């Protein structure tokens, strides 16, 4: 009888231990071209990175494990929930040449991130490159016209993320070489919503996009900020 009890206790302990080992923090990404890769983003999204010849642009990132988000997840025992990154997408609905793009703007993709423990927002670069209007700081009652502007759209984005994923940690990852008004906008808006910023620095690029070295630097800098909040498959 004691032998059976011991075996049963050992089996239960093993199951619990394996369950704990398998538990991983789930990470979702809401991004632009910097976070795309062929076969790893939401179907239908535009890409910039990939392994097939048509994505050979002269950038040395040609394998998914070279991307910043794959390095971040693989190196730190995390799990990818959803990567909803779209090349060329803006946070607001005003895109290149003044085109109205409510279909691929960050604020249009908020509900597609699954059930993340951590949400990583990587945007603003195309808003600057496209010359999207900044607009005013606005924290409620957004109209379609308001969301054509970067500041109201970023406010709306964080508001929706916090309501849609109330238990998820949210990080705003900011590219290098943005105009000062974009950094200032992120600072003010992130402070209002309690969003942690990751302000990137010294990122090597090829054709305006992170190279392998740049991707590794992004992964390292993001983990330096968020790593202290993650322990043994849980966020704190």
Give the positions of each predicted feature:
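Generic structural signal for helix capping and beta-alpha/helix-loop junctions
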Residues: 37, 90-93, 180, 207
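N-terminal secretory targeting modules
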Residues: 1-64, 74-75, 112-114, 166, ...
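A mature extracytoplasmic/lumenal domain signature
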Residues: 31-33, 85, 176
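Conserved SGNH/GDSL esterase-like catalytic core that processes O-acyl groups on lipids
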Residues: 26-28, 40-135
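Alpha-helical cap/lid subdomain in secreted, periplasmic
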Residues: 100-236
């Amino acid at each position: 009888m004691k032998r059976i009890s011991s075996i049963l206790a050992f089996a239960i302990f093993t199951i619990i231990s394996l369950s704990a080992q398998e538990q991983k923090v789930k990470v979702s990404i809401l991004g632009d071209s910097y976070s795309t890769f062929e076969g790893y983003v939401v179907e239908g999204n535009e890409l910039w990175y990939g392994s097939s010849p048509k994505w050979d642009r002269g950038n040395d990132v040609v394998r998914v494990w070279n991307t910043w988000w794959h390095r971040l997840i693989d190196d730190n025992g995390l799990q990818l929930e959803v990567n909803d990154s779209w090349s060329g997408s803006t946070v607001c609905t005003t895109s290149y040449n003044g085109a109205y793009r409510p279909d691929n703007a960050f604020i249009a993709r908020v509900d597609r991130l699954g059930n993340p423990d951590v949400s990583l927002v990587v945007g603003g670069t195309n808003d600057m490159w496209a010359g999207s209007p900044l607009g005013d700081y606005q924290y409620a009652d957004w109209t379609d016209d308001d969301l054509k502007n970067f500041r109201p759209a970023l406010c709306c984005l964080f508001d929706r993320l916090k309501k849609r994923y109330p238990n998820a940690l949210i990080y705003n990852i900011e590219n290098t070489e943005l105009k000062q008004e974009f950094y200032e906008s992120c600072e003010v808006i992130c402070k209002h919503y309690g969003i942690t910023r990751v302000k990137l620095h010294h990122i090597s690029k090829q054709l305006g996009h992170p190279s392998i070295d740049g991707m590794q630097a992004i992964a390292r800098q993001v983990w330096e900020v968020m790593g202290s909040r993650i322990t043994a498959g849980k966020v704190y």
